[in-house]
């Protein structure tokens, strides 16, 4: 049985409007914006020492065809203790 992840590293979410989404996460959850790139991305965290726990990525008119209109979860990244743990999980 593979070892469990240590913790959730971050989530990446596709949004239609990064400015509005950033404001929502700041107002509702009190997240800190670590880095903001208008019209493209916001990297946010509950902990000001972290670079990001939530990454908001705007899908604009120039998004690849397979991504147009596909707002929502893009990926989650989990922290594991070692590369061997990752390999075990992959094989499972």
Where are these regions (language model features)?
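Generic hydrophobic, aliphatic-rich segments that mediate packing or membrane embedding
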Residues: 69-72, 89
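Conserved active-site tyrosine of GNAT-family acetyltransferases
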Residues: 21-26
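Conserved short beta-strand elements that form part of the metal-binding/catalytic scaffold
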Residues: 32-70, 80
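Vicinal oxygen chelate
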Residues: 15-20, 77-92
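N-terminal beta-strand motif that seeds the catalytic metal site of vicinal oxygen chelate
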Residues: 1-19, 73-76
């Amino acid at each position: 049985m593979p070892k469990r992840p240590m913790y959730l590293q971050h989530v990446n979410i596709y949004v239609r409007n990064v400015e509005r989404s950033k404001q929502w996460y700041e107002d509702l959850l009190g997240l800190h914006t670590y880095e903001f790139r208008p019209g493209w991305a916001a990297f946010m965290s509950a902990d000001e020492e972290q670079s990001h726990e939530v990454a908001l990525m705007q899908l604009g008119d120039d998004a690849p065809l397979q991504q147009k209109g596909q707002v929502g979860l893009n990926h989650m990244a989990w922290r594991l203790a070692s590369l061997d743990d990752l390999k075990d999980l992959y094989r499972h």
